[in-house]
Swiss-Prot record:
This is Alpha-conotoxin GI. Not hydroxylated; hydroxylation, on a synthetic hydroxylated GI, improves its folding but impairs its activity against target receptors. It is found in: Secreted. Changing P54A: 10-fold decrease in inhibitory potency towards mouse muscle-type acetylcholine receptor. 2-fold increase in inhibitory potency towards rat alpha-9-alpha-10/CHRNA9-CHRNA10 nAChRs. Expressed by the venom duct. Disulfide bonds join C51-C56, C52-C62. GO terms for molecular function: acetylcholine receptor inhibitor activity; ion channel regulator activity; toxin activity. It comes from Conus geographus (Geography cone).
Amino acid sequence: MGMRMMFTVFLLVVLATTVVSFPSERASDGRDDTAKDEGSDMDKLVEKKECCNPACGRHYSCGR
């Protein structure tokens, strides 16, 4: 195989991997329900003005 063909195969593999790992908007099969629950928990803490997560901790107290 030539270098150009190997590079083309590499790009196709990268593209296929990206498309497969890209999250879809279809109905969930339950694999990411925990992640959704954790996000809602963080929203509840932000409503209380308490957040120990570094993403929101600089704006709110930790509450510990």
